[in-house]
Regions:
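A non-catalytic, amphipathic alpha-helix used as a structural packing/dimerization or gating element
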Residues: 39-46, 114, 118-125
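Short glycine-rich anion-binding loops that position phosphate/pyrophosphate groups of nucleotides
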Residues: 62-65, 86-88, 136
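Well-ordered beta-strand positions
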Residues: 56, 79, 128-129
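Phosphate/pyrophosphate-binding catalytic cores of soluble transferases and nucleic-acid-acting enzymes
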Residues: 12, 38-39, 92-97
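Glycine-rich phosphate-binding loop of ATP-dependent small-molecule kinases
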Residues: 1-26, 79, 150-157
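A glycine- and Lys/Arg-enriched "phosphate-lid" helix/loop adjacent to the NTP-binding pocket
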Residues: 24, 76-122
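NTP-dependent small-molecule kinase module
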Residues: 4, 92, 117-157
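ATP-dependent small-molecule kinase phosphotransfer cores
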Residues: 14-64, 69-72
Length: 157
């Protein structure tokens, strides 16, 4: 999407690793486990605050914008687009990829369905645009190009 839109791309998990990794922690999951939820969220917000001000596409973790400091940092950057996916597809992806550490931690106090519903509701509440991507075939260049074009049309409306 960033290539099609000709924008810089930032992946927040990659930025966490490049800013906070060490000999002991080489992935965002390891950093999350070592730092805990609150400190990890503070790290995310700090990174978002330090990104260059130009237009960019920023990939956030599913729980990032549940934290007010991260939301404030991203809110000033421009349009917030929620790339929405229906719950059954989210469950399918989580089953294939495994649960992120933040979800594992949150599931100590709430069921997964409640956590995901809260996240989706939050995104629907704060997003400037909601763009469904259930139908996008990520292995098809034409599908990705069509989705990118549809998103551009949405942003211009």
């Amino acid at each position: 999407l960033a290539k099609f839109l000709n924008l810089p791309f930032y992946d927040l998990d990659d930025l966490i690793v490049s800013n906070y990794s060490s000999a002991l922690y080489s992935s965002s999951a390891e950093i999350y486990k070592a730092y805990g939820d609150q400190k990890f969220s503070e790290c995310e917000a700090r990174i978002l605050e330090t990104l260059p001000p130009e237009d960019a596409l920023i990939s956030l973790g599913g729980g990032t914008l549940m934290y007010e400091a991260s939301y404030r940092a991203i809110q000033t950057r421009g349009a917030l687009v929620f790339l929405s996916v229906e719950l059954p597809l989210i469950y399918e992806r989580l089953e294939k990829r495994g649960l992120p550490e933040r979800l594992k931690e949150a599931m100590k106090t709430k069921p997964l369905s409640e956590i995901l519903t809260e996240r989706i509701d939050r995104m629907k509440e704060i997003a400037d645009y909601i763009f469904p991507v259930d139908h996008v075939d990520h292995s098809s260049k034409s599908s990705l190009e069509q989705a990118s074009q549809d998103l551009i049309t949405l942003l211009k409306s």
